[in-house]
From Swiss-Prot:
Residues 163-394 are annotated as: 3-hexulose-6-phosphate synthase. It comes from Archaeoglobus fulgidus (strain ATCC 49558 / DSM 4304 / JCM 9628 / NBRC 100126 / VC-16). The gene is fae-hps. This is Bifunctional enzyme Fae/Hps. In the N-terminal section; belongs to the formaldehyde-activating enzyme family. Keywords: Carbohydrate metabolism, Lyase, Multifunctional enzyme. The keyword Lyase applies. SMART domains: OMPdecase. It catalyses: 5,6,7,8-tetrahydromethanopterin + formaldehyde = 5,10-methylenetetrahydromethanopterin + H2O; D-ribulose 5-phosphate + formaldehyde = D-arabino-hex-3-ulose 6-phosphate. Residues 1-162 are annotated as: Formaldehyde-activating enzyme.
């Protein structure tokens, strides 16, 4: 028994071809799906056999299932015409080229789910796009593409055409974290508009802003920066699970818990963050011994994703916070964010000390040239992910 899955997208415009494909032996789930497709017809999604010409099906047999509801004869003509012929030719050529073993052609069946946009018109594009997509989907299925290593490499680099690139993890440090402590939403939005897009810039929704407008202020910020990574700085001291859930419900990507909170509160907050798919920060501002505090949290069975060594605005005459970053990373599997006293001229020193996340606030948000200030910091950091990679389908 053999069961394989493949997928491919080729082309552009309304004629773009997107093929989801199952190929397998007749005694596998592929065989059951093939039989069900032909036996259980659905209005607007009637499956049809792929034929090279009338009265000549392919080997292996292939059934085509329209993804988009067929509502008129124009759409039906495109499915029963160029799409059907393209899938059939792709299957036959896959056998001829050895993608599907010739000696096993009678053992396999193919189920191809085909997308034809209601506004598609150019039959030549429909044919060639669907031919290429079907053959590529078969090849990927037979090669078990992608392997797990490819998926893990690509998952944070991928740009989805309808969604964009959504950061859910801080996987490629260092990052510039811009702390937005301005308690005026109008001014905040003006600042955001001036900050260049980069997947190495993340935004901290500061406590004053969150207190004034509530957690869901993030939704307002997403109107300007929809794909950005937002850290909601609640400085949680109690009900850690509740506040972490509130952050997640507001589409925050991370929540900040105070290191001064009871250990039980921190643990509940971290676990709720894990449950809801967001990251957890523990802010060590005013914590006398951050390493000891982390040991206590670890002993309780958890660790945050990020530890923030935070020198408060009112304490900027104290020792730079990044001096402790290396020691923390030696003992704990966490990212370290540092805040306070960071300027473009000392960014490289801070990173060399072990910081993964550089937190700046007024140096950007109060700058006369916001974009210029950001670029000064970013000049000491990495370029965007795959900025110099030539992308085709992959």
């Amino acid at each position: 028994m053999e069961f394989r899955i493949g997928e491919a997208l080729i082309g552009e415009g309304f004629e773009v071809a997107h093929v989801d494909l199952i190929i397998g032996t007749k005694d596998s789930p592929a065989g059951i799906a093939f039989a069900n497709a032909l036996a259980n017809l659905s209005a607007g999604h009637t499956p049809l056999l792929a034929v090279l010409r009338p009265n000549l099906i392919t080997k292996p047999p292939a059934v085509i299932v329209p993804k988009v509801t067929v509502k008129d004869m124009h759409q039906a003509e495109l499915i029963f015409g160029p799409a059907q012929a393209a899938v059939a030719k792709a299957v036959a050529d896959a056998v001829e080229e050895g993608i599907i073993p010739r000696e096993r052609a009678d053992e396999y069946v193919v189920v191809a789910s085909v997308f034809i946009h209601p506004n598609a018109k150019n039959k030549h594009k429909i044919y060639y796009y669907n031919y290429g997509a079907t053959k590529l989907a078969i090849k990927r299925a037979m090669q078990n593409f992608p392997d797990v290593d490819t998926v893990l490499y690509e998952k944070d680099r991928s740009f989805h055409p309808f969604v964009g690139r959504k950061l859910t993890k801080l996987w490629d440090p260092p990052y510039l974290q811009i702390a937005i402590d301005i308690p005026d939403l109008g001014e905040v939005l003006k600042v955001l508009e001036q900050i260049p897009d980069s997947d190495h810039i993340v935004f901290e929704v500061g406590t004053p802003l969150a207190k004034r407008y509530g957690c869901e202020v993030i939704l307002k910020l997403r109107e300007v920066k929809p794909d950005a990574f937002y850290i909601l700085d609640l400085k949680t001291l109690d009900v850690g699970n509740l506040e972490a859930r509130m952050a997640a419900d507001a589409t925050a990507n991370a929540v900040v818990i105070s290191g001064l909170a009871p250990t039980s509160t921190i643990v509940k907050g971290i676990r709720e963050a894990e449950k809801t798919g967001i990251l957890s920060y523990v802010d060590m501002m005013n914590v006398d011994d951050p390493i000891k505090r982390l040991e206590e949290i670890q002993k309780a069975g958890v660790l945050p994703n990020v530890v923030e060594l935070h020198r408060a605005i009112d304490s900027e005459d104290k020792e730079p916070p990044w001096m402790l970053a290396g020691k923390i990373k030696e003992k704990f599997s966490v990212l370290v964010a540092v805040a306070g006293g960071i300027r473009p001229e000392n960014v490289e020193e801070v990173i060399a000390a072990g910081a993964d996340i550089i937190v700046v606030g007024r140096a950007v948000t109060k700058a006369r040239d916001v974009e210029g200030a950001v670029r000064k910091f970013m000049s000491h950091m990495k370029p965007d992910t795959d900025q110099f990679r030539i992308m085709t389908d992959f």
